[in-house]
Amino acid sequence: MFKAKTEIIERLAGKYPKRIEELEKIFDGKTNIYIDFANVRPWSNKLGWHVDPKRLKQFLDSFDNIGKVNFYYGTLEKDRVSEQFAKEIRGYKYELVTKPVKIMSLSIDVSSIPSDSPDIIKNFVRGPLLKKFKVETIEYLNNELLELNKQGIKYIEDMKCNFDVEIGRDMLIDYERNSVETFVLWSGDSDFADPVAQLLKDKKKVILFATARRVAKELNGLQKDGLVIFDIQKIRDFVCWKKELKN
């Protein structure tokens, strides 16, 4: 049953009643939500608007059969903005699942390799694509890296913090121990294909909230087995930043 948690949600529900009806059918039985925020946040580049965690939680809380809403987010240690964001997520009453972001140093030092060597570039370009490069392309890229080296830049930092193991584990635990009937995953990552396939095989309802062209083919292929993909464009005004509301 739907009961708006805020006046804005109530107004929007009156404006888009069919969206609410559709979601009431989706959130069928005991429902848990799993939000892979590192996957969700970049969607704004394509969507042209942002998912607001506070408004999203208020919207989800308006459906009384939604139980746990897990929010997976990597925290940058000793980073004030990152730690404050995690604090806010807890304040919104999400079940926050977090761990430190790993920061990896990747060498871009080409000063001791031949100009036509792919030894450094191969760490950033996948093999099948690298094989398509002409020697001139490799030489050009190495020359660009050498210019950075001359400026004293010998490595770059890359951040990594995946939650595919934790999310897959939590979904299966909720199935085995907590009698969850409907599993709603906010992600389009191929890493979730196996746990989703298992849940579908066990006759559970799985809904993928994502956006067009951000769903891996492995997940798209599970639609024939019952996976439902819901385009979050349909609920833009319910979950976007307030300043991005259409009206």
Regions found by a protein language model. Name each.
Residues 2-140, 152, 156, 200-214:
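Domain-level signal for Mg2+-assisted phosphodiester chemistry and nucleotide/NA-binding surfaces
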